[in-house]
Amino acid sequence: MVQVGVIGGTGYVGAELIRLLSNHNKIKISGISSTSYEGKSINSLYPGFYDLKELVCEKDDEVIKRSDLIFLALPSGVSEPIVEKAVAKDKICIDMGADFRFKNESSYKKWYGKNFITPKLHESSVYGLPELNREYIKKSRVIGNPGCYATSVQIGVLPLISKGLIEEKGIIADCKSGLTGAGKTLSESSHFVNCNESFSAYKVANHRHTPEIEENLNSVSKEGVKLTFIPHLIPINRGILSTIYTTPKDPIDIEKIHQKYCEFYKEEPFVRILPLGKVSKINNVRLSNYCCISIHYDSENNKLIIISCLDNMIKGAAGQAIQNMNIVLGFDEKEGLTALPAVF
């Protein structure tokens, strides 16, 4: 069995990763690390992980030593030195922060305030959106797992961008996320009394997923994508719903657009295109690795509207990381990820 380690295994994403990996038939969790909880067992932090008594938080180096592949569930800007060390020891790394989501160093510096530490590592890394980069992922040793909003928006518009069907400047992505998207660290915005029975936008036109979406869509763009992205927090635990407004270049037949989506994603194991007239919703995807898309046309205003939903903790984070692991290790891409969405 492949030995898999988790660096930063006690946050929401790390815990979700451990939960999913525990049901994977091709790997064994070799260890988890945490600077905050070193020496504590994972089931003392998450009692629902009762059967994982043997998983005790260790130092990063101990986990790296015993692992063939490393997941890094760390804050953005922290992973790169650890990845450099692990790659030198011939380990495969899947980083779930933003450290390897960009090829453009100036863009990364503008939005994250850091330069690349090891530029050659970035040259060889791959952006881990399977629906865009599957063939590159297969050959990579360093994979930058996409952001949750970025995954939802890109899967939503990839068929339109790649086929040149819409105006690529002026796309509007209006996105809503559950509170787990804000992470485990306490904050005013995620405090119960500030989010319960409320609904708010944040980082309006200033969210770090904007340049990530633009850079990676531009790999298939003909004109250069420019995006207005407005994220919102809603008082649910998990899930993202992205409503994406686009302007078709030419008069469209909505049935033909629907057919193009079905054709574009027909080989994708985790993308679901709803029939025309149906509306995608978070309950279509909760607790699953699926991205569910519905397609709508406002003929009065010539707006093609895409609604893209996913579970931000799974297809938006831990599940997509496991999907990337399956690809790079040559496993069935669906291994460990076949659970259907929860009904409610």
From Swiss-Prot:
Its EC number is 1.2.1.38. It catalyses: N-acetyl-L-glutamate 5-semialdehyde + phosphate + NADP(+) = N-acetyl-L-glutamyl 5-phosphate + NADPH + H(+). The keyword NADP applies. SUPFAM superfamilies: Glyceraldehyde-3-phosphate dehydrogenase-like, C-terminal domain, NAD(P)-binding Rossmann-fold domains. Its main location: cytoplasm. The keyword Oxidoreductase applies. It is found in: Cytoplasm. The active site is at residue 148. Pathway: Amino-acid biosynthesis; L-arginine biosynthesis; N(2)-acetyl-L-ornithine from L-glutamate: step 3/4. InterPro entries: AGPR_AS (IPR023013), AGPR_type-1 (IPR000706), NAD(P)-bd_dom_sf (IPR036291), NAGSA_dehydrogenase (IPR050085), Semialdehyde_DH_NAD-bd (IPR000534). One of its GO terms (biological process) is L-arginine biosynthetic process. One of its GO terms (molecular function) is NADP+ binding. One of its GO terms (cellular component) is cytoplasm. Pfam families: Semialdhyde_dh, Semialdhyde_dhC_1. Keywords: Amino-acid biosynthesis, Arginine biosynthesis, Cytoplasm, NADP, Oxidoreductase. Belongs to the NAGSA dehydrogenase family. Type 1 subfamily. Catalyzes the NADPH-dependent reduction of N-acetyl-5-glutamyl phosphate to yield N-acetyl-L-glutamate 5-semialdehyde. PANTHER family: N-ACETYL-GAMMA-GLUTAMYL-PHOSPHATE REDUCTASE, CHLOROPLASTIC-RELATED (PTHR32338:SF10), N-ACETYL-GAMMA-GLUTAMYL-PHOSPHATE REDUCTASE, CHLOROPLASTIC-RELATED-RELATED (PTHR32338). This is N-acetyl-gamma-glutamyl-phosphate reductase. It comes from Clostridium kluyveri (strain ATCC 8527 / DSM 555 / NBRC 12016 / NCIMB 10680 / K1).
